[in-house]
Structures are given as structure tokens and as C-alpha cells.
Design a protein with these regions (language model features):
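Type III/flagellar secretion export determinants
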Residues: 1-125
Length: 125
């Protein structure tokens, strides 16, 4: 669905930003992805780099989605609509809907939504 694609793009752009790479500075998605890969590689080889990347993953809410920064970068470069990121976002969206239906209240979604706002990660439409 559209909103998943939008969430995915948002997540990719925010992941880039977390790596110090701004989407607007690149004329094409592939240039942007290449810059993300480069930044990721540079952080990874630094001492404490892996820890820093895990911290970014938590900050971006990727851990809750069961994704790594590498997954996001791969998904950005892939353009395949059925990649790991899309599947994770679909699961999360479905889970939020199921929880709402199950409890008959929006409480579960509200908690998720508060966390999401914290990360600015997902928009529940």
C-alpha cells in the first residue's frame, strides 16, 4: 500500500540522516544509497563503530522492526517492493490494527504511536 511505501522511504531518508547523509544533497536515489553505504562502512570500521550503529538502530526504532541499518540500505538500493523493510512495516501495521481490534480500544496503538512520534518513524494512517 501507499502508506507502506511512504513509511519505507521515510525510514530510508531518516536512516541516511542518522548516518550523516542527507537525501536532498543527492540527485538520485542510487547516489544517496551509495553515500549511505560509504558512511555505514566508515562508521563500522571505527573502534566502537558497531556499538554506535546499534545505538542508531534503536534510535530509529529499527530494533522493534527486527531490522538492521544494513537491511534498510539494501532495501533502498534494491527497489524491490517485497523486501525485508516492506515486510517488517507491513507486519507492524497489521499488528497495530490487530491489537486495536483485539482490545477494542486504541490504547495499544496510542502507546505505539507515542513511541513512533518519539522516533518520528511511522505515521498510522
Amino acid at each position: 500500500s501507499d502508506s507502506i511505501a511512504k513509511q519505507k522511504l521515510d525510514l530510508i531518508v531518516r536512516t541516511g540522516r542518522a548516518l550523516g547523509v542527507e537525501r536532498n544533497n543527492y540527485s538520485s536515489m542510487s547516489d544517496f544509497v551509495a553515500a549511505m553505504k560509504k558512511a555505514f562502512g566508515e562508521i563500522k570500521v571505527q573502534s566502537g563503530g558497531t556499538g554506535a550503529l546499534h545505538a542508531l538502530e534503536r534510535q530509529l526504532g529499527l530494533d522493534k522492526l527486527g531490522l538492521s541499518i544494513e537491511d534498510v540500505i539494501e532495501s533502498a538500493g534494491d527497489g524491490d517492493s517485497n523486501d525485508k523493510v516492506t515486510q517488517a512495516l507491513e507486519r507492524q501495521t497489521k499488528k497495530a490494527k490487530d491489537e486495536t481490534n483485539a482490545t477494542g480500544s486504541d490504547q495499544a496503538v496510542e502507546i505505539d504511536s507515542a513511541a513512533a512520534n518519539l522516533y518520528g518513524l511511522l505515521s498510522f494512517n
